[in-house]
Amino acid sequence: MAAAAEERMAEEGGGGQGDGGSSLASGSTQRQPPPPAPQHPQPGSQALPAPALAPDQLPQNNTLVALPIVAIENILSFMSYDEISQLRLVCKRMDLVCQRMLNQGFLKVERYHNLCQKQVKAQLPRRESERRNHSLARHADILAAVETRLSLLNMTFMKYVDSNLCCFIPGKVIDEIYRVLRYVNSTRAPQRAHEVLQELRDISSMAMEYFDEKIVPILKRKLPGSDVSGRLMGSPPVPGPSAALTTMQLFSKQNPSRQEVTKLQQQVKTNGAGVTVLRREISELRTKVQEQQKQLQDQDQKLLEQTQIIGEQNARLAELERKLREVMESAVGNSSGSGQNEESPRKRKKATEAIDSLRKSKRLRNRK
């Protein structure tokens, strides 16, 4: 209902139903006749007391809309943001007040979420493996999902809110975010994030889709070369007890919104500088990793060469052992015959040479 009304307001270029809403709020549907002219008492006669006005004959400016804006905001603060968004249909003055309250409500719920998230993070351990098993793990997951929703809503609405073309329209979304945050703060063992955030995801997605499809095309036609800087700047003040509160004063009360935007821009710049530093560190780490990989490849190549050398040495040792065995067998066989005593010194010399070569090869292998 509030979204359809916002679309109609955007097409007409103004909010509410005009200044005549204050007369409707008075409760009198018929025009009262003017009071009779006072009769001057005759000389010597006693003056009669003037009759009191009936409740339906009170001045029409004695209504809710005619109260000061601070009083109206104090009264509306007891209502939900969904009801406040629907009260924009009353009149232009009520539309101005409700717009300010909706914009401030979105900023307040962002600050409340930041406070809750800071409190939960302060109690969580620093290690990621310990966080998963912590009792506040689900609290952190829910708050992270709410942060994503707030970022999407901020990107969708706040561009046009800062341009004073509209306000934060879906008040029901603010109520739902407050409900989720209070549930997280008051529950020790909450449900899973997708169960808690199902309603918030549904209504926020519908609100953003409707805004992009129905209202953004109308607002975009007002963006280029438009002299209208928003209802809060261009609407004349409604006469009443708070007429001294001019439009510029109304706009000055929205300066916290621009301060928040400036703070966010500074935070974005700080985050950008941090990202640049992290990228530089990542590039340095990648260079170190490449150097380590190159050293590992060189070590693998050397290991392969050493393995080949050891294999060749083992083959030579096996061959020398085989020759030594043959020499020893032949020496033993020849020593048994008497006719071959002349060749025994030569055989012994060969055996001695074979043993020496075997010892040298073993020494070489030990050095490797």
Swiss-Prot record:
SUPFAM superfamilies in the record: F-box domain (SSF81383)
Show where the F-box domain sits. Answer: 61-109
Matching InterPro entries, A to Z? F-box-like_dom_sf, F-box_dom, FBXO28
Task: Name the CDD domains for this protein.
Answer: F-box_FBXO28
From start to end residue, where is composition biased (Gly residues)? Answer: 12-21
Q: Which GO terms describe its molecular function?
A: identical protein binding
Q: Where is the composition biased (Low complexity)?
A: 22-31, 42-56, 333-342
Q: Which residues cross the membrane?
A: none
Q: Could you tell me which residues belong to the region Disordered?
A: 1-56, 328-368
Q: Which UniProt keywords apply?
A: Centromere, Chromosome, Disease variant, Epilepsy, Intellectual disability, Kinetochore, Phosphoprotein, Ubl conjugation pathway
Q: Extract the PROSITE patterns matched here.
A: FBOX
A single GO cellular-component term from the record reads: kinetochore
Q: Where is the protein situated, by its record's location annotation?
A: Chromosome, Centromere, Kinetochore
- In this chain, composition skew of type Basic and acidic residues spans 1-11
Phosphothreonine: residues bearing it? T270
GO BP term, pick one? protein polyubiquitination
Lineage: superkingdom: Eukaryota
Q: How does it assemble?
A: Part of a SCF (SKP1-cullin-F-box) protein ligase complex.
Protein known as? F-box only protein 28
**What species does this protein belong to?**
Homo sapiens (Human)
